């Protein structure tokens, strides 16, 4: 009897599980996120606003190697006193396809175009007020258009992933480089589409609005030498409802007390101290006389 009991107990112990599907915690499951307005807001902040940050060595506005810094380093606008393989090729125009600072803005941020495309699809099915949905979708369109323009300005036409391909990430699909017409149509369409849901001027510091959209459109049209449309955008920004104007003192634009002043069209938000004196450390010579420990 004891042998039979032990046998039954062993058989029970050897019983296997029937559900072997593990739950992943390192990726967003669209089956249960986003499901409400709060989720959709979080998805836009994390998927659309994320690349437009300045976090030391991360973000398209990084003070170390952003689009602007790398672009300006290839001119006489910016200078870096660090003598290494990162900066010298930029100042001497001797970069190659393997030069990290030449390619990092593509390798780090092109993927966000796919993230924004998926974000646009996912928030479109979330129940929320029409006004809020229009705003979040407009912000996503602006993010896609702006990032695509930055990448286009640096690298020319780039691959633009389709929603179908993004929903099937395990398929081995190599997206072709967009044609010149496809690229420019994508940028212009995204930016103009964003105008439908954005406020004229946001009351939330650091968020996108029509003023920013028209500014990027103006720069894009200038890039394409479409001077008539560029002028239209510029004249739009002069209208009183945008509230833009010049500060009496140039230095006052950047003081903490004047945060969000009338001369700022868009400001990248970050925690205070994140980039404290970072570019001074790059640009000033090693024997610069200062008592500032951050330099």
What does each model-found stretch correspond to?
Residues 44, 53-58, 74-78, 83-107, ...:
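Elongated scaffold/linker segments in the mid-to-C-terminal portions of large proteins
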Residues 157-181:
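Short coil/linker segments at helix-helix boundaries
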């Amino acid at each position: 009897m004891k042998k039979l009991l032990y046998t039954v107990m062993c058989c029970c112990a050897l019983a296997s599980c029937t559900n072997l599907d593990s739950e992943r915690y390192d990726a967003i499951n669209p089956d249960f996120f986003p499901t409400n307005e709060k989720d959709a807001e979080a998805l836009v902040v994390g998927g659309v606003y994320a690349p437009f940050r300045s976090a030391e060595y991360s973000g398209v506005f990084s003070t170390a190697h952003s689009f602007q810094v790398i672009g300006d380093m290839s001119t006489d606008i910016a200078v870096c006193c660090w003598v290494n393989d990162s900066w010298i090729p930029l100042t001497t125009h001797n970069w190659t396809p393997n030069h990290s600072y030449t390619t990092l803005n593509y390798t780090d941020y092109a993927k966000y175009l796919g993230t924004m495309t998926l974000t646009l699809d996912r928030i479109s099915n979330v129940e929320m007020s029409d006004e809020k949905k229009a705003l979040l979708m407009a912000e996503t369109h602006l993010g896609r258009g702006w990032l695509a323009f930055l990448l286009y300005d640096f690298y020319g036409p780039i691959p633009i992933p389709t929603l179908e391909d993004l929903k099937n990430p395990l398929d081995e699909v190599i997206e072709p480089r967009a044609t010149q017409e496809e690229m420019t149509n994508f940028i212009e369409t995204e930016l103009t589409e964003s105008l439908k849901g954005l406020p004229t001027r946001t009351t939330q510091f650091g968020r996108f609005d029509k003023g920013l959209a028209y500014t990027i459109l103006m720069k894009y049209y200038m890039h394409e030498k479409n001077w008539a449309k560029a002028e239209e955008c510029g004249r739009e920004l002069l209208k009183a409802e945008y509230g833009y104007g010049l500060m009496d003192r140039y230095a006052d634009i950047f003081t903490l007390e004047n945060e969000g002043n009338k001369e700022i069209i868009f400001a990248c938000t970050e925690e205070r101290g994140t980039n404290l004196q970072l570019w001074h450390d790059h640009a000033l010579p090693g024997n610069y006389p200062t008592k500032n420990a951050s330099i």
